[in-house]
Every structure is written in C-alpha cells, then in structure tokens.
Curated annotation (Swiss-Prot):
Name of the protein in question: Type II restriction enzyme NgoMIV
Cofactor note: Binds 2 magnesium ions per subunit.
Biological process (GO), any one: DNA restriction-modification system
Quaternary context: Homotetramer.
GO molecular-function terms, A-Z: metal ion binding; type II site-specific deoxyribonuclease activity
Record organism: Neisseria gonorrhoeae
UniProtKB keywords: Endonuclease, Hydrolase, Magnesium, Metal-binding, Nuclease, Restriction system
Phylogenetic classification of the source organism: Bacteria, Pseudomonadati, Pseudomonadota, Betaproteobacteria, Neisseriales
Cofactor: Mg(2+)
EC number: 3.1.21.4
Catalytic activity: Endonucleolytic cleavage of DNA to give specific double-stranded fragments with terminal 5'-phosphates
Entry binding sites for Mg(2+) 1: 140, 186
Gene name of the record: ngoMIVR
The keyword Hydrolase appears for this protein: yes
Amino acid sequence: MNPLFTQERRIFHKKLLDGNILATNNRGVVSNADGSNTRSFNIAKGIADLLHSETVSERLPGQTSGNAFEAICSEFVQSAFEKLQHIRPGDWNVKQVGSRNRLEIARYQQYAHLTALAKAAEENPELAAALGSDYTITPDIIVTRNLIADAEINRNEFLVDENIATYASLRAGNGNMPLLHASISCKWTIRSDRAQNARSEGLNLVRNRKGRLPHIVVVTAEPTPSRISSIALGTGEIDCVYHFALYELEQILQSLNYEDALDLFYIMVNGKRLKDISDLPLDLAV
C-alpha cells in the first residue's frame, strides 16, 4: 500500500495529463518545453514519458495552461494539507486567487493596511507615482487561517479573558481579520521577466507585512535547472521552489548525462532551495 502523499502526487500528475496541460504535440514538443532549446526539449520529453504523457494535436495557450496549473496546484495543496490536521490543527482555507484581485491579501491581518494605502494612492496621483506598484501583491494561491474563539482557547484551561492578551493575533475576540499563512506563486514555465517576478513579489510581502511573515513559495513545472535557478538561488525573497516532478527531473538529468545541469540541480536541492511538490504540504505545517 502506497502512502497517501504518493497517491496525492499521482492524482496531481493525472489531472495535469487528463486536462492536456502536460501533453506532447504532434511535433514531439511537450507543453512545458521551450521547443527552440534542445535541453529543454529533451528534459521535458523525458519527464513527460515517465509520467506517460499522451500526444495531442496542439498545446493549450500559455495563459490557459498557467491558470489550469494554478487550479490543480490549489487542489493538491487543499487535499494534502487537510490530512495534516493532527500535526497542524486549525481552521484553514486554500484559495486560488490568480490576478483577479490585486488587493486580495488586504483581506488578511498582516496586510490589512494596504487597503488604506491603495485608497490614499487613488486620491493622490503624486503619492501613487511615489509608491509605484510595490504594495500590490497578487499570489496565485493563498493558505489562510481563521482565528480562534476564546471558548476554544480556554477549552482545557482558563487562559484568557477580556483583560489579558488583548492584542494577540490569533484571537478572534480581538476583532482581528484572518491570518495569511502562505502565499504560493505558480509558474508553469520560467521564461520571461514576468515569470521571475515571484522574487520581487516575495520581497514586497516581506517589506509590507505587519506581524508574522507568511510562507512564500513558488511551484513550477519548468524543466531546465538553469531557469529554475533564476528563482531558486539566493535567500530572503522566497522560502523555497517546489518542482512538480523533482524525482523525475533528477532521473532524466542523470540518463541524459547533463552533468552541469545535474550539478546545478544538486546545488539547489542540497542547499534547500528546490524540493518536490510532495514536500510542500509538510513544509506548510511548520
């Protein structure tokens, strides 16, 4: 019998395959490959073969693939993370945000002040010009935690009343908003400046928060280690990059004998900058 997280990982891959998000076109190019780059072509094909990708007449448009990848990542996080209630109990929510609401995170406690900032910028063009877009942060997926009522806090012992711990972030009785636990950026591929904006958004999350910093992570299906490293290497902006098929990526790099790419792969893995998608739920439980 396989562990549940192995099953969740297989379901995640099956959804990508069944939806033709990960697919091979009739020219042999896999949907997450750069067809003009030989290494990208070969690595992506190797991973797709291991995951049993089928041939389709044409790949999905880039934006469609990206949105679908976000949705499937969100479903994976939701399903896997809820199995960790015994490790990380709480009233959790996982939500796909996308680019629909540039102030979605202002609904949560650490970033509630951004609403007032946005309003002030709206009313003052000079302030808007000075601020730029540094305060607008649009995660693809968020994990949030609802606050705890005093009755639950006091369930085993009488810990708090209206005169103590009156500013505690986790306490519902203090009139606080829910907490942002994690910001997840999904990048189907990493081939443009826009794809690499995950680092700048991560830095904005660090700079603009009041209170506890949420987890800041990136999930990608990019096949080439060199492009993954453009986001993964370095520290400060993001916790870690999670690859949709890390084990398969390692296997293909070994079989293709891409030694320099494999060296970079191990630098990222051993440096705790790159992990598998199956590691994400447990890391979110920290």
